[in-house]
Amino acid sequence: MSLSFRVDNTAGPARRGVLSLPHAEVQTPVFMPVGTVASIKAVPQETLEELGAQIILGNTYHLYLRPGVETVRKMGGLHGFMSWNRAILTDSGGFQVFSLSELRKLNEDGVTFRSHLDGSSHFFSPESAMQAQIGLGADIIMAFDECTEYPAESARVRESMELTARWAARSRKYFEEHKHEVPWKAGSTVKFQVSSDANSRNLKPETRNFDGYTQSLFGIVQGGMDPALRKESAERTIEIGFPGYAIGGLSVGEPRELTREIVESTLEHLPKDKPRYLMGVGTPEEIVEYASLGVDMMDCVLPTRAARHGLLFTSEGKISIKQARYAQDQGPLDPNCDCRVCRRYSRAYLRHLYASNELLGQVLNSVHNLSFYLDTMRRVRASLDATSTRPSGVQGCPEP
């Protein structure tokens, strides 16, 4: 058994569902914080649990380079290595290799690239990417794909889409032959995390035996900014057969309006009974917008990356805490936010921490931004539970 997914309610194309995975029962739509190297930057695991994070991401490319897949595998996979007993998704490393355009060579077999750490040469293929992700042991893993740059010539996009389809078939073949090698010990048990409501802050532990449970491999739809190629990619990926489908290759520099157009048109071609994952987006307003279109899963580095640069999301709009006007501001960061940061600290103190380059500033900023994102998705789920005509979620911000 890999995953099960059910849709409990709809409002137009938006869906309210439950995704059951080996390590957690995930309420959807869901935002997934990104932990590139098995760490959500500046935020410890116990804080993530308090914030209600149901599922987080790890990055295969970075973990392959350091500490190495074998190190993680010997410790029971990422769950044991990072002491996280909720769900995890790993990407295939394809996007990161794509970003190393000056350091990589691509052919039918796979991609040869140089490490950004020490310049050493490495090779990723669909098979080796699956081998690495099986060793990392996430609940959901991703097929190996290629992401095209923006803008790109139509011939280049077609060639890349067709390569991704062939790699998807190879990814699934290897996965089906080796999925039993996941580092969960046969007969071992885990404190399975269950949440039955839209809150998801207080997940209840239940003991689950891992016998019979496997990872789930998602296929990825590519095709650049061409709706026809996206349709063809979706059809070919569905023909291969996966328990879930991702929309990749977006947020690579294209206008937001074009992103929405491609997401909306691609969703029309994806199965309604399978989870849909939009990779690498976006702002709080955007994740509400994409949930309203029928996306079930989203991830983005923005909340923590922006936090480290002093950009904070609030119900009153974005705040650049580095600005001098906050130096004497005794008010909370967001008067409508109930996170631990807004309950305790003033804008003046947060501005002081940033100006002083104190690490605590990065921690508190990151905790707030993640809380804002996760609370936004909780409100989206609550609005769908209430069968509203469209999801709402970002307090005080105009609907997209």
Annotate the PLM regions.
Residues 1-18, 26-30, 42, 145-151, ...:
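C-terminal extensions of enzymes
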Residues 149-154, 158, 244-251, 359-362:
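Glycine- and acidic
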Residues 177-214, 388-400:
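Intrinsic disorder/low-complexity segments
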Residues 1-184, 324-327:
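Non-catalytic, usually N-terminal nucleic-acid engagement modules in DNA/RNA processing proteins
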Residues 69-72, 307-320, 374-377, 386:
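C-terminal helical cap(s) of enzyme catalytic domains, especially alpha/beta-barrels
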Residues 24, 56, 91, 133, ...:
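Conserved, mostly hydrophobic/aromatic
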Residues 154-166, 173-174, 229-240, 361, ...:
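Short, electropositive alpha-helical surface patch
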Residues 178, 216-218, 222-333:
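Glycine-rich phosphate/ribose-binding loops and adjacent secondary-structure elements
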